[in-house]
Amino acid sequence: MTIKVGINGFGRIGRIVFRAAQKRSDIEIVAINDLLDADYMAYMLKYDSTHGRFDGTVEVKDGHLIVNGKKIRVTAERDPANLKWDEVGVDVVAEATGIFLTDETARKHITAGAKKVVLTGPSKDNTPMFVKGANFDKYAGQDIVSNASCTTNCLAPLAKVINDNFGIIEGLMTTVHATTATQKTVDGPSHKDWRGGRGASQNIIPSSTGAAKAVGKVLPELNGKLTGMAFRVPTPNVSVVDLTVRLEKPATYEQIKAAVKAAAEGEMKGVLGYTEDDVVSTDFNGEVCTSVFDAKAGIALNDNFVKLVSWYDNETGYSNKVLDLIAHISK
């Protein structure tokens, strides 16, 4: 059965979700809603400064997109309740505007005829978050779910492997995070986050992130044990998590590497990766795993106190897991 998907919001994540869906036979994008006109939408889909040209054909006909010969309905509605998803048979909406992140607001998609909704960002209420490699097995039929954040998708699988094998007493996370659309090209007004208003290409910017605390929501056994922060850096894509933890059960760094490698080759294949190469951030542009453990970058002070490093393409990896969650809730 092909799952019919509508995308609301055709920004960075909306477009990368669309691109990733073209490589899957189980998911078909049938509709896109954004306030862009169709010609500009086609242009934004065709050309991408980070991920290159779209691999396929993109045309506009009668105000709609024709991608690889298939028509995709284009609308420009501000209110999701008016989207008439049922007219094109939408099963699941990928809510990618970054605006409708509560059950109450996202439920407008259900009103408009969709069966289920996946939020492509952490929910702002108690809407459950699901992360592949962490808690997909806890899904219990909810019609509105969140795929959490790109950083939580990197941290949670790694934290789960470490906690399951050695136990985590407590930990601090830092994500060295690529620039995103919320930042400023030059210094500009940012009333809630003064540092965040400084020029993205000129600065390393300390920032807050709820990603580590959110791990406690997807892995309740780690609730209250992790917190973290971010540094925004002047790179266009690919971020890296630095997780420093105290272990319950003493372990050498070699034992930790072996446990992560076993998980990456076993139950977490496609989610958690493992490398012993001398890699840098651009080596992960286009990476579909949401967390690639860098065995050479981590260090241990002793057998109870370690720093672990894991890479993620904060656009591609996350967007692929949005599709995995869509498939999972459609079973």
Swiss-Prot record:
What GO cellular component is one of the record's annotations?
A: cytoplasm
Coiled coil ranges = none
Q: What's the chief localization of this chain?
A: cytoplasm
Question: Residues that bind NAD(+), according to the entry?
Answer: R12, I13, D34, R78, T120, N314
Organism, as annotated = Escherichia fergusonii (strain ATCC 35469 / DSM 13698 / CCUG 18766 / IAM 14443 / JCM 21226 / LMG 7866 / NBRC 102419 / NCTC 12128 / CDC 0568-73)
Q: What is this protein called?
A: Glyceraldehyde-3-phosphate dehydrogenase
Q: Does Nucleotide-binding appear among the keywords?
A: yes
Sorted alphabetically, which PROSITE patterns does this protein's record hold? GAPDH
What role does it play? Catalyzes the oxidative phosphorylation of glyceraldehyde 3-phosphate (G3P) to 1,3-bisphosphoglycerate (BPG) using the cofactor NAD. The first reaction step involves the formation of a hemiacetal intermediate between G3P and a cysteine residue, and this hemiacetal intermediate is then oxidized to a thioester, with concomitant reduction of NAD to NADH. The reduced NADH is then exchanged with the second NAD, and the thioester is attacked by a nucleophilic inorganic phosphate to produce BPG.
Q: Where in the cell is it found?
A: Cytoplasm
Active-site positions on this chain: C150 (nucleophile)
Q: Which InterPro entries match?
A: GlycerAld/Erythrose_P_DH, GlycerAld_3-P_DH_AS, GlycerAld_3-P_DH_cat, GlycerAld_3-P_DH_NAD(P)-bd, Glyceraldehyde-3-P_DH_1, NAD(P)-bd_dom_sf
Q: Which top class of enzyme applies to this chain? A: oxidoreductase
Q: Which GO terms describe its molecular function?
A: glyceraldehyde-3-phosphate dehydrogenase (NAD+) (phosphorylating) activity; NAD binding; NADP binding
- Reaction equation(s) it catalyzes: D-glyceraldehyde 3-phosphate + phosphate + NAD(+) = (2R)-3-phospho-glyceroyl phosphate + NADH + H(+)
Instruction: Site (Activates thiol group during catalysis): give the residues.
Output: H177
Q: Where does D-glyceraldehyde 3-phosphate bind?
A: S149, C150, T151, T180, T209, G210, R232
What SMART domains does this protein's entry cite? Gp_dh_N
Q: What is its EC number?
A: 1.2.1.12
To which protein family does this belong?
Belongs to the glyceraldehyde-3-phosphate dehydrogenase family.
Pathway, per Swiss-Prot/TrEMBL? Answer: Carbohydrate degradation; glycolysis; pyruvate from D-glyceraldehyde 3-phosphate: step 1/5
